[in-house]
């Protein structure tokens, strides 16, 4: 059967290819003294707190399982708005909040609403691989701009200004980032947003790990940015968020985006046609995420992630898997495996394939599943 050129352009999500191989091997070694240790998939090992689970069960028992509005339950949009006020001191109109089937759906909707054929979107290298495919699916082109450890693997306003061209539509950023766990400094973020706004472009920012910030200097939403002249830049920014990471609901497939008011009707039309609505059960469950007991539990878990980071990164460095920048958020480590590749006789000069081969060697030698950098760039 002929496959569309659009589908052919989409590369495999190699993270999941590694996960499949690890799952097969895990079954073979499950009852040995060296079972598989999974460090590869970007999800918490915590599950939804008890109140959230109970809310889901109650929704099913009460028959609250039919379609909602395409933009989501009004009550949940209100709760999210209240969370922005409580946590960040931001007044976000609930009408700007659109519930989606995970952050991936939010990114897809944003790209389809904003990108025309031939438009270019600037993004850092390394970055989350699916982002460039969301752009491609909207018939746009991703322009990857190399970053360095000195930049915390994030774009600078100077890079954005230098790379901006006649077909540039905007930038797609993530702070904290997958795969580096690093954030954009607020001053730099303001300069980037100002640069983009002055050129009539749009700033999309993935903030799904913002709740897992470990450094107060970086833990603020870009929605609160103010320009040099006092204009509220945040009103022109699209922020993508999710119940997956901080709220520990990965398989529930529920996220949201905060969009400029004028863009919401277009996003709603797309959502009506593509998704009908997000999972109704997940939405009712998510209402309980904002109860005081749930929020307290999330903060305890965030502290646990920081403690793990403080132990894990020095140990990786000691093993020769150098992490050039200490992550300030999320739960990732962007480690340099070239030295380990050399020790194991692997190709250290080709970062993409070297990391791929290293991941499989690690899987088979030590029964540890880790994600190679092949997907992410650089």
Segments from the language model and where they lie:
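C-terminal edge-of-domain segments
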Residues: 64
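PLP-dependent class I/II
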Residues: 3, 7-11, 16-18, 28-59, ...
